[in-house]
From Swiss-Prot:
O2 binds at H170, Q179. This is AA9 family lytic polysaccharide monooxygenase G. Its EC number is 1.14.99.56. Cu(2+) binds at H15, H98, Y181. Its cofactor is Cu(2+).
Length: 236
């Protein structure tokens, strides 16, 4: 695959940001309840505290807004290349070379505006890997940057952090190389039954640099089966 190095070089700066959250058809605006960074670069060290909700080298901006969401409904994370990007064409989202899975996690917290997200309590509620030759990131890139996430109906009500993530594997043949893009939204989830308690993981800790879903060549040999990193998806 002689073209791969050229492809990687040309796409090296094609990053992305989870910039806003849409609930019930209402977009809460860039940085409205989402801790957006000042730079759109990735986190590559899975052992960094920044793997939780982003951070150094991408300082995030605090927000006092907490978005109320009904348990059981779908919300939409909106991804854009930069905070100032207004379009929704594929190039406005992330370079198409950035192929990999999408994921989403929740963490129950006492105060969504102050909890750093670092540490335990996280459970996965969505993932989309490699299916029928199409990556989860491709669906978001070609779908106007829309990343649909269902909030479980059976969790306890209260404040949560929602961690939406896209993982780009174009340079993941060695570790570090995989590019993790994530931000955290601040939610107040209402109407949950609290009938099930999810098993949880920690960030950092949920991912390993040696995991086959983190260290993988997606160019050669051709990918036939992909193992998404992290825990299984929590279901009610």
């Amino acid at each position: 695959m002689k073209f791969a190095p050229i492809l990687l070089a040309s796409a090296a700066s094609a990053h992305t940001i989870f910039s806003s959250l849409e609930v019930n058809g209402v977009n809460h605006g860039v940085g409205g309840g989402v801790r957006v960074p000042s730079y759109n670069g990735p986190i590559e060290n899975v052992d960094s505290a920044s793997i939780a909700c982003n951070g150094a080298p991408n300082p995030t901006t605090p927000t006092s807004k907490v978005i109320t969401v009904q348990a059981g409904q779908n919300v939409t994370a909106i991804w854009r290349y930069m905070l100032s990007t207004t379009g929704s064409a594929p190039n406005d989202i992330m370079d198409i070379s950035h192929k990999g899975p999408t994921m989403a996690y929740l963490k129950k917290v006492n105060d969504a505006t102050t909890d750093s997200g670092v540490g335990g309590g996280w459970f996965k509620i969505q993932e989309d890997g490699y299916n029928n030759g199409v990556w989860g990131t491709e669906k978001v890139i070609n779908g106007q940057g829309r990343h649909s996430i269902k909030i479980p109906s059976c969790i306890a009500p209260g404040q949560y952090l929602l961690r939406a993530e896209m993982l780009a594997l174009h340079g993941a043949g060695n570790y570090p190389g995989a590019q993790f893009y994530m931000e955290c939204a601040q939610l107040n989830i209402v109407g949950g039954t609290g009938s099930k308690t999810p098993s949880t993981v920690a960030f950092p800790g949920a991912y390993s640099g040696s995991h086959p879903g983190v260290k993988i060549s997606i160019y050669w040999p051709p990918v036939t089966n992909y193992q998404i990193p992290g825990p299984s998806v929590f279901t009610c």
